[in-house]
Design a protein with these regions (language model features):
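N-terminal signal-anchor transmembrane segment
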Residues: 2-87, 112-114, 398-402
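Long extracytoplasmic/lumenal interhelical loops at the membrane interface
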Residues: 56-61, 177, 297-363
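Transmembrane alpha-helices of multi-pass inner-membrane enzymes
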Residues: 78, 212, 391-401, 408-434
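Membrane-interface helix-loop-helix junctions at transmembrane boundaries of multi-pass membrane enzymes
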Residues: 85-101, 217-228, 265-271, 377-394
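Aromatic-anchored transmembrane helix interface
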Residues: 99-110, 119-144
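Alpha-helical transmembrane segments of multi-pass inner-membrane proteins
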Residues: 153-177, 195-259
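A membrane-periplasm/extracellular boundary helix in multi-pass inner-membrane enzymes
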Residues: 165, 172, 257-306
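Hydrophobic transmembrane alpha-helices and their immediate junctions
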Residues: 276, 280, 362-402
Length: 434
């Protein structure tokens, strides 16, 4: 009798837990919206938005056009999550309890927005896309099932594949389709490929981190597809012109390869498929080298290192700016007009090639320290909920994001990087993901 009663109770609970037809439709719409959001975030740059009629990267145009479409959609999805929960307090409390660093980063973005507005500065939307959007991502993807994360991973791989192919086509054709623009004006002297990520150095940073993530076993690609993707991304990396990204990838990637080779030799087991694939790749290597040489790939690679376009001088000159600003102003935040004037004097119109130094010059030491701590806690929180192997791309990201203006300007780079870590290194089921 007790068994029959327990069975009836279990059936009633299952009926309650089973979503109705309306809810099932809404859940499908939510899944499609998440995939669309990932596509917008990773695949839509400011250059593409300009082609679509939105002046995202300039100072003219409507205020609404200065915020990335992925940010709008992320806010809508967060709002839907609150509505779907029935009691909005529950997901808010869950975010505060389980993603405190993400909440902190988003709050810092809002506070930075208020600070810039109070000081009469420009670029208010930069703090929203750079920090608030990044802070929302771990909250938005919290407790997502494997199928959802798998779809987002597929979108990420597809966009990175298209980005690499478009970068190579831009190199071969000499035409840039979606270059980085400021108020519609592209820098004609910059011949680096832009592809789908807009700024070439941001593209190189994301590509380098993606390569290292794949090298550490991130994602679900089969070995042959993984090796092919790594090779393609390595070739495309050169077209984006990131010398630091190229060197960092080769150094860290070589370390990963040597460790893997040592492990394989110690075990004494080399898979037959891997050996056959290596032999096949070696036979194709001369053909690939000839094709790349004919396309001017190696000339481009050498040119990146022989001529830096004044980048090294700019890194020296940006330190000279500090001599003209009193320490008290550096502590609390120098005058925006003074900083912009000094940039023009020292020939730094293209940007200050270090995220932290640029943030100090525009927001002061105290604000920059808070932002650095918030970003560090954020990356540690994301890494904590990922499986092993995530720290290598994080190390590369920290190195590369400080080789250009990076997080000091308006960018979705941190949000893209967080999405990459979450979908390529999802936690194992044993760690409690539902």
């Amino acid at each position: 009798m007790r068994t029959l009663r327990q069975t009836a109770v279990a059936r009633r609970r299952a009926a309650v837990a089973r979503p109705g037809p309306v809810l099932r439709v809404l859940l499908r719409v939510e899944a499609a919206a998440l995939s669309l959001w990932a596509l917008l975030l990773v695949g839509v740059s400011g250059g593409l938005l300009w082609v679509l009629g939105l002046n995202y990267e300039g100072i003219t145009g409507s205020a609404a056009s200065k915020i990335h479409p992925a940010t709008y959609l992320a806010v809508i999805l967060i709002g839907w999550t609150l509505v779907r929960a029935g009691n909005p307090v529950i997901p808010v409390a869950g975010a505060l309890n389980r993603r405190p660093a993400s909440v902190l980063l988003a709050a810092c973005g809002v506070a930075l927005l208020a600070l810039i507005a109070a000081r009469g500065g420009a670029g208010l939307a930069g703090s929203i896309d750079t920090f608030v959007l990044a802070g929302l991502i771990p909250i938005l993807l919290m407790d997502r099932d494997a199928a959802t994360l798998g779809r987002l991973e597929t979108v990420f791989h597809a966009v990175m594949l298209a980005n690499a192919l478009l970068g190579l086509f831009e190199l071969a054709s000499g035409q840039r389709f979606f270059p980085y623009r400021f108020d519609g004006v592209a820098f004609e002297s910059d011949t680096r490929s832009a592809a789908l990520q807009g700024h070439p150095l941001a593209n190189a940073t994301l590509t380098a981190c993606y390569i290292l993530a794949l090298a550490k076993g991130g994602g679900r690609l089969v070995p042959m597809a993984r090796a092919a993707m790594i090779g393609l991304q390595l070739v495309a990396l050169v077209t984006f012109g990131g010398r630091s990204a190229t060197v960092t990838t080769l150094v860290l990637g070589s370390g990963v390869g040597l460790v893997a080779l040592n492990r394989t030799l110690r075990t004494g087991r080399i898979p037959l498929a891997a050996a056959a694939g290596a032999c096949f790749a070696l036979t194709l290597l001369p053909v690939l080298v000839a094709i790349l040489a004919a396309a001017g790939f190696f000339d481009t690679l050498l040119d990146r290192f022989v001529s830096d376009g004044g980048s090294a001088k700019a890194r020296v000159d940006m330190l000279s700016v500090f001599d003209a600003i009193p320490f008290r102003q550096l502590l609390l935040g120098p005058d925006f007009l003074q900083v912009n004037t000094l940039r023009r004097i020292y020939g730094l119109e293209w940007g200050i090639e270090n995220s932290i130094i640029s943030a100090v010059l525009y927001h002061g030491i105290l604000v920059t320290a808070v932002l650095v701590i918030a970003v560090g806690l954020y990356l540690a929180e994301v890494a904590r909920d990922c499986r092993r192997g995530v720290w290598l791309p994080i190390l590369a990201f920290v190195i590369l994001v400080n080789t250009f203006e990076g997080l000091a300007g308006k960018t979705t780079l941190l949000a893209k990087f967080a999405l990459m870590l979450i979908v390529l290194f999802p936690p194992l089921p044993a760690r409690g993901r539902v």
